[in-house]
Amino acid sequence: MATTFISFIYRPTSSSLDTTELLEKEYQKIYKPLGKFLFTHPDFHFTFYFPGNRIQFYKKKRPEFLTLLKQLIERNQVEVLGGAFYDPLMPLLFTADRNGQLDLLSAEIRQSIGKRPRGCSLYADCWDSSLVNNLVTCGFEYILLDSSCIPAKKLNYLPLIMSNLGKAIEIFPVYHNFYEYTENFADDFILKIQKKIVKIERKGQLFQPNPDRIICIDLDRPDLEKILSEDLFGALGKCFSDELEIKTTLPSIFKKNSGIKESVYITETINKSYLQMDENAATSDINSFYELQEAYESVKKLFSRILYVGMLVNQYKSDKMRKNCAREKLWQGQNGQGLLSASSSLRQQSYKLLMEAEKILREDNTFKESLTCFDYNSDGINEYICRMQNYFACIASVGGSIQELDILKNTGNYADNLANGTYSRGLFVDHIFTENQFQNYKEGLPADDGIFSRVPYSQIKFSQSHHELQLGATARFGTSKQRVYLRKKFLINSTGMIIQYILRNDSDKPLNAILAVESNIAHTKFNPEAISYYNLETATDDQKNIIDTSKSLLAQNKNQYFNNIDSIRLSDTEGGISFTFEPNEKSHYIYYPLVSELNSKIVHMTFVSTMFWDVSIEPGKEIEKTINFTITNLKKERKPKIT
């Protein structure tokens, strides 16, 4: 008689923002009661997966739990899975980083509980066929993948096997929703299992009649807390002891005794339940991370940054100890939650760690400021990378704006903005509006894209030695399709940039328009539980105005924008950074805060700061505007000494 084996699995996720308090709370609600139950029920099997931060926490704060795990492992009741130490999306990493993170967690598990893992779990079940080689090289024999990532015809409650380039690894599908909280929880669970098996057996057998089958059940935290608090595992244990055809087991034990494996080939996949980018997004078209990054601009930007810093670290040769320190920061910054969540705090933490990795490499006294040109984000168009003493910036050819701005002191990306829909938000986004369009724009309403914000700029001049870049673009403006040309010049230095605009009317009619330069400064330390705002000051002649950044300028100035502005200063007092914009000619000015929500919660905040001029240009003529952009460190206020 064939037996159906049940393997219960708990696979928590980790992020770089996990605190000791959060891990302690999880221990008290999950691991402590579960450990007690398993110790008193030796016939009940359970499989754990611990990200790297969990293992480190137990070693420091709860060594008694690791001692208990050792005893449970010795009697073949518990198995601990391996994986990547910092829960990255594995297919995105270079081979050195893949193997390094896998080996790091395996070594930590072996040192902590005395046994090297043979099974593997990947964050978000993010899979690529090339991972077979990495997993086998690192000593893994099988991997768990969510059933939604596997072709339905292969889901027969049997282990699968996949080969790639001469190496093979077994795959155990992981299932959900096998239980309902009814009065007869245990009996209903057993009945549901039996019905599932009968349904599968009606399909016919592949190799032999009545093979043993395994159902790996993934328990999420709320369900596991409920099961433990109501002692539902105890009821299940009694049913399993009375039921001869259904038992609990471990994937490793089943692997040794099972002879049937179905062949499968999975090119790339991802567990869609981890995607938290947009509550209105249709995830049916997203079947891999590569499709995800094409759908969400913020994901692609962070992914490009991860690849770039990974390249810097892996190519560094001077100091092995420095390289290892930088690599540790790189691995922490590769955490997958920053890529799969709309939360700006998780993304900013990844940018922070990546900038710290680059900063470690820069401190070897061989760093030189540079301006380089290459395809940074793999879109087929060159970007311009500015590695200055105090910051890192990426200037995009499409739109000619700054799409990434990482400050070394603050180590966060101030250009981390969510897409506007029609154009990419960043710093020095160029618009040319009609009166009606600008009326909508200043009120935060849809106002088209201002033409130049989405136009590809062509390179006019590129000087690495002088850190100079000139871009040019041609567009058609208004209903009459007037031909206008905009030349944009960047002079890049250690503390900022000088940006020069030359707007030329190439049509045969006078050009009357509004030239607007929009800069979106992201909140790098945004906390939805305690929302804070940047400080904003404007100067006109000798008069200084302090603006309340919690609401738009129009709302607090009787629906009027500011005129004759000489300079604008937006300050992140918490990060100790200020940004100053000084036009060569007095400008008009509007400001408003922009927030993004997910499930009715604010997850991102940007401060939209726009300088604009009314322009009137005769045919064949041009005008010039220049903005001096400066990044400065704020002096921290010293508290008086108490004597």
What residue ranges belong to the model's regions?
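CE4/NodB-like, metal-dependent polysaccharide N-deacetylase domain
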Residues: 97-124, 192-217
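Acidic-aromatic substrate-binding/catalytic surfaces of carbohydrate-active enzymes
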Residues: 24-25, 96, 100, 389-463, ...
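Acidic (Asp/Glu-rich), glycine- and aromatic
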Residues: 406-407, 484, 492-539, 634-643
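Short, well-structured secondary-structure segments
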Residues: 3-94, 100-101, 118-122, 141-147, ...
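Active-site and substrate-binding clefts of carbohydrate-active enzymes
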Residues: 2-32, 39-41, 158-169, 176, ...
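Active-site/ligand-binding surface loops and adjacent short beta/alpha elements
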Residues: 510-514, 520-591
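Beta-strand-rich recognition/accessory modules
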Residues: 370-375, 463-482, 496-498, 562-643
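Catalytic domains of cell-wall/extracellular-matrix polysaccharide-remodeling enzymes
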Residues: 100-157, 222-236
